[in-house]
């Protein structure tokens, strides 16, 4: 299967995405969280101002214009969407979910979504929604036979030579990076990455090694972070791990270290337990984790060789800070770059729109 100058190959535990030579751009979108107030289950669920601004005819203004802006800026090879894509409680018909999928399919760019804690709340059959995404041309999604909805790997590969360069043996492929796409739960189950999910990750990496000869560095993408983000912030000296109400703006109210950046304006505590996953992740070359869930947190902090990043919230649905809307660009450097540049960089792309701008 080919899409947007990329080739998608499906494996047992995930996908292999062939990307061109040069730097590779991954765009993270998170907490788009489309709300259709016309589908409120009870008349008092939203206040009147929310009901009026979140009707079905305003989805472009509240969400998709921000997605288009981000895609136009980043020109990504891959889009990852880290949960709370459509607020299921406000989409019992499934109409907004299908529109969401159709919009991203129409971009012609491979996109890899995970579930957040609100996606599962629809009265629609979630398994059918998973099957719907699995059948889409550009969507890299796999339900996975473990706890949750959507547990799989995406491995970025590129030709290590042009056809015919390898003594007539044809094109060889080398892996650049494997992304572990995981359901962090929080709706049907308590948050946290489970033992069986770690087992699936282990099998996925075996498949990567079998097909490419090695396991590349890892990213992890999921919705709800646990205590690992608090510990990273403490290690960097920005807060005490147990100070769940800490607020700061790195480089503004506290000095930045190691290229860190972003703002913490949402309380975050210990929800779930990802300690076993973190042990596995680090032992297998993991060095970047990308999450969402906390709409007013945008910190990106390096700790113990891993960069912990809250993606910038995309769009205007649900609570947010108007000056913290946009997307997050992850750039993998060209392996041919011998300048000593970091293996990857992370940058928030802030929107140029005002919430009051006309659609």
Feature roles, as predicted:
Residues 2-8, 12-16, 20, 153-158, ...:
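Binuclear metal-dependent phosphoesterase catalytic core
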Residues 38-42, 124-127, 230-235, 322, ...:
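Short aromatic-enriched loop/helix-cap "lid" or pocket-rim segments at secondary-structure transitions
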Residues 31, 67, 79, 84, ...:
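Divalent metal-coordination and catalytic microenvironments
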Residues 1-95:
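N-terminal active-site segment of His-dependent metallophosphoesterases
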Residues 2-18, 96-216, 328-329:
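Extended active-site neighborhood of metal-dependent phosphoesterases/phosphodiesterases
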Residues 23-36, 176-185, 221, 307-313:
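Active-site-proximal beta-strand elements of phosphoester/diester hydrolases
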Residues 74-77, 172-174, 178-180, 189-294, ...:
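His/acidic metal-ligating clusters that form di-metal
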Residues 33-38, 87-90, 113-125, 187-189, ...:
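Active-site environment of divalent metal-dependent phosphoester hydrolases
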């Amino acid at each position: 299967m080919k899409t947007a100058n990329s080739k998608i190959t499906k494996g047992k535990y995930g996908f292999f995405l062939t990307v061109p030579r040069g730097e590779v751009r991954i765009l993270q979108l998170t907490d788009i969280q489309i709300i259709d107030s016309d589908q409120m289950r009870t008349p008092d669920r939203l206040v009147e101002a929310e009901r009026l601004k979140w009707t079905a005819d305003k989805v472009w203004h509240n969400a998709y214009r921000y997605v288009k802006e981000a895609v136009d800026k980043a020109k990504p090879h891959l889009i990852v969407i880290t949960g709370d894509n459509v607020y299921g409680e406000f989409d019992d018909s499934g109409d907004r979910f299908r529109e969401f999928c159709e919009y991203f399919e129409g971009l012609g760019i491979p996109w890899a979504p995970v579930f957040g804690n609100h996606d599962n709340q629809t009265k629609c059959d979630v398994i059918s929604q998973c099957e719907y995404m699995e059948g889409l041309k550009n969507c890299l999604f796999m339900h996975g036979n473990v706890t949750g909805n959507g547990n799989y790997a995406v491995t970025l590969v590129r030709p290590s030579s042009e056809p015919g360069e390898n003594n007539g043996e044809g094109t060889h492929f080398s892996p650049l990076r494997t992304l572990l796409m995981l359901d962090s739960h929080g709706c049907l189950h308590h948050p946290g990455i489970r033992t069986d999910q770690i087992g699936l990750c282990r099998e996925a990496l075996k498949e990567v090694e079998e097909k490419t000869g090695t396991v590349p560095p890892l990213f992890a993408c999921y919705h709800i972070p646990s205590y690992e983000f608090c510990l990273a912030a403490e290690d960097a000296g920005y807060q005490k791990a147990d100070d769940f109400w800490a607020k700061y703006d790195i480089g503004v109210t506290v000095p930045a270290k190691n290229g860190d950046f972003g703002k913490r304006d949402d309380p975050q505590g210990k929800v779930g337990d990802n300690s076993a996953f973190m042990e596995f992740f680090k032992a297998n070359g993991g060095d970047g984790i990308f999450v969402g869930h906390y709409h007013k947190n945008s910190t990106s902090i390096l700790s113990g060789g891993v960069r912990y990043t809250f993606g910038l919230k995309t769009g205007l649905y649900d609570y947010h800070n108007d000056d913290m809307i946009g997307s997050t660009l992850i750039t993998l450097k060209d392996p041919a770059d011998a300048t000593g540049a970091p293996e990857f960089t992370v940058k928030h792309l802030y929107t140029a729109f005002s919430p009051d701008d006309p659609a």
